[in-house]
């Protein structure tokens, strides 16, 4: 096999692992004539009545033989202005070459994208979650409108992965996701070449305004945090969702761990051609792979790794695309029985580059399967079960310090907690690793915009020893709109050394890079008159991550008085894409989807 030869010429254990993981996809012996694999594209390539369609395809360079081949849509979330995405066009070309070698016809197309890291802390972040829906809509539109028989999608940044998987669930034709890969760690010359990443850049501002670092050090950090292409390196949203996709069986083994620009990633791209051909032959579709058991596996992996709160929104939305209902209670049930064992950023020390060196996500899955935490019987895009795929991988490296044994976890239960109570009757999602404690009671400081909080922090209005619950509201699906991520405020709190003194609560979201005492996705949101809209400065708020409660300690009589005089503010946008989004988006607890009939 060509891709195995490519890997064999590379040095090192990682390349050998990749060769082992990708073997078994050789399908050149399959006779496409024996089994019709172009059952969708034949709608336009077959009938004489579709002569105009065929004329346009000939114009693209197809010949008579090509017209009989299955057509594969190769979707890339490529754009130049983001390290997570800037290399994806090249990966798409490599996938197309693999598709061609497998005897199929590949057509590349693109989606839009929004960089969370670049838009963070600005109104541009309102477009981030919405981009998930546009990505899903665009891939679905091209696949259905062009009658492609199969799909390979290549995502990079946070919302790309769920957008691709939602689309695959909707059109339900043989599909594979090829993750763009993680960035390598940066190093700060001003700090003895200490490893740094994008969250280091975010936290540098809080460190600077509190005098912990000087301006040359701050600039050094932001200059060296991101050394090249690839998604943010910690167990943030991109790596969380790529790992979830692999756990569900929608990627080739190892995809979520292979670094951007690595020989393993290039080999995976070529192998996708043979793999998609096998899926066509066996007629294995996304809804055959993304079963309830597969989603359970993804939730378990997320809890063990300390993954992003965004996984809750995204997995609920992906499940909906394949006709499965996931709820907040499903996540809490998994969290109750799943230990948190990964010492990975943002709450820990290591990044995906380090995890890859000890075996990557396949070795983690192999360990969890051996311990009975995940179901290995689920079918995957290899045509084999998850357990069969994992046999080709080594156990976690002996003596490694990144993944703890289940007998000695960082936390005996998962870090994601679903909290309900008088402040969040329909639920909220907390990211609590235990380092910041399990309970928090403090007085509310209420802000209707995140930059108002940043200004208050700059003025020194928050002190150590004063327990404060900062509320940033009107940032929900409709009110934001788009549930902007609060990485700028959470990073500023941690950078200022206030992680144990200030809890942050919002109807918006948190980046996968956030850490601290954080509660997001508060439902109902402020825009629709949820209790969070009625909170006033000085109100006492009690957070209990053991009992999973979130309560506003204000009596019902006073709440009724506040409710009687409250009026909903107008939507922030009166035209354009965000108005359409605000009018159609569901609640956070339902995944913030825009194609619901409810």
UniProtKB/Swiss-Prot annotation:
Q: What exactly does this protein do?
A: Dihydroxyacid dehydratase that catalyzes the third step in the common pathway leading to biosynthesis of branched-chain amino acids. Catalyzes the dehydration of (2R,3R)-2,3-dihydroxy-3-methylpentanoate (2,3-dihydroxy-3-methylvalerate) into 2-oxo-3-methylpentanoate (2-oxo-3-methylvalerate) and of (2R)-2,3-dihydroxy-3-methylbutanoate (2,3-dihydroxyisovalerate) into 2-oxo-3-methylbutanoate (2-oxoisovalerate), the penultimate precursor to L-isoleucine and L-valine, respectively.
Q: Does the keyword Amino-acid biosynthesis apply?
A: yes
Q: So which cofactors does this thing need?
A: [2Fe-2S] cluster; Mg(2+)
Cofactor note from UniProt?
Binds 1 [2Fe-2S] cluster per subunit.
Can you name this protein?
Dihydroxy-acid dehydratase, mitochondrial
Q: In which pathway does it act?
A: Amino-acid biosynthesis; L-isoleucine biosynthesis; L-isoleucine from 2-oxobutanoate: step 3/4; Amino-acid biosynthesis; L-valine biosynthesis; L-valine from pyruvate: step 3/4
Positions of the catalytic residues:
511
Origin organism is Schizosaccharomyces pombe (strain 972 / ATCC 24843) (Fission yeast)
Question: In which domain of life is the source organism classified?
Answer: Eukaryota
Give me the reactions it catalyses: (2R)-2,3-dihydroxy-3-methylbutanoate = 3-methyl-2-oxobutanoate + H2O; (2R,3R)-2,3-dihydroxy-3-methylpentanoate = (S)-3-methyl-2-oxopentanoate + H2O
